Amino acid sequence: MNPTLAVLGAGAKAVAVAAKASVLRDMGVDVPDVIAVERIGVGANWQASGGWTDGAHRLGTSPEKDVGFPYRSALVPRRNAELDERMTRYSWQSYLIATASFAEWIDRGRPAPTHRRWSQYLAWVADHIGLKVIHGEVERLAVTGDRWALCTHETTVQADALMITGPGQAEKSLLPGNPRVLSIAQFWDRAAGHDRINAERVAVIGGGETAASMLNELFRHRVSTITVISPQVTLFTRGEGFFENSLFSDPTDWAALTFDERRDALARTDRGVFSATVQEALLADDRIHHLRGRVAHAVGRQGQIRLTLSTNRGSENFETVHGFDLVIDGSGADPLWFTSLFSQHTLDLLELGLGGPLTADRLQEAIGYDLAVTDVTPKLFLPTLSGLTQGPGFPNLSCLGLLSDRVLGAGIFTPTKHNDTRRSGEHQSFR
């Protein structure tokens, strides 16, 4: 019986791993069965229904960084070129050709697709490879024996390994229930409506791409001033030259850097930075201002939301209070959002493997080459937390082909090797 890899979420990472597994299976290579457990649908976080976008905004990375990119597989000796060639059947270009839109895309200057179009591409790949999707919201993650159990309201999925993807839920809010404070999902729901947002003073919390896409949307609404609140001293622009981009698609030299050097690189290229496109729009709009600080407290008072900002200046901590008519919490997801799903026994297993209490820093530093938490059995793949140890491209869309290599090449999926005298057409294993 084949081992099973369960993926929490049916987004780009799930589709990329499933696509490569499908191609390897066609090549006669033993691979796990990939099952995605998803509450909405394939690529939902790129659609309005997922709560993270209205679907109309543009993808922040090149669509050619698709499910097989960078097409540099290293899984099957002497057959990796064949594997890469087969993976091109599920490339962005192949999708455009299949939907009779390749020439138009080229003629328009190869524009970044909308989030909705990107989700349609992911759904196209998932449909062609026959990705198995179990529809339901995972309410509990537990370890039973040597397997994972993903429990939804309707069913329980058993698997030999688990990969958790996605940013979690977009419904997080500073003041739940207060109409003057919008979560990410509430903002996009309002933005998608016919009525424009109408407010004098608006605050957007966050300095990353989630907040940036919200600012891009707010430009067309009736707001007098927009204040961006983030801990950084200013709003940094993401580096998008060759040297920055190569960090994402080729992590070969990443391990040679110290943790401090890696954190510095991530801060300059990935986390808490705006794209050059958004920065250009900010430059042209005099309604935009920036406040440095972290939100320590929020309260509704006299028709406003009062935010207490905490700012470190040298060795001293200062607090200031600011009033806004509308606050949008675009600070993004909690990196440990999924830990609330773990059973107590599972948390104990994780802390035993980590050698201490479960924290974001400790978990990130424990991600190994295969993008799984080291010293934890059964395997738990956490690609969204792998940037620090493995390279900045793995948590996002920048090297999905390398990601699938790392996951499918993990030791748990390597069956007993067959005799090297196997005939053509017999199954072979990795390496």
UniProtKB/Swiss-Prot annotation:
- From which domain of life does this come? Bacteria
Q: What induces it?
A: Induced by iron starvation conditions and during infection of human THP-1 macrophages. Transcriptionally repressed by ideR and iron.
Signal peptide annotation: 1-21
Its UniProt pathway annotation is:
Siderophore biosynthesis; mycobactin biosynthesis
**Gene3D superfamilies (alphabetical):** FAD/NAD(P)-binding domain (3.50.50.60)
* Primary enzyme class: oxidoreductase
Entry similarity comment: Belongs to the lysine N(6)-hydroxylase/L-ornithine N(5)-oxygenase family.
Annotated protein name in UniProt = L-lysine N6-monooxygenase MbtG
Q: Which organism is it from?
A: Mycobacterium tuberculosis (strain ATCC 25618 / H37Rv)
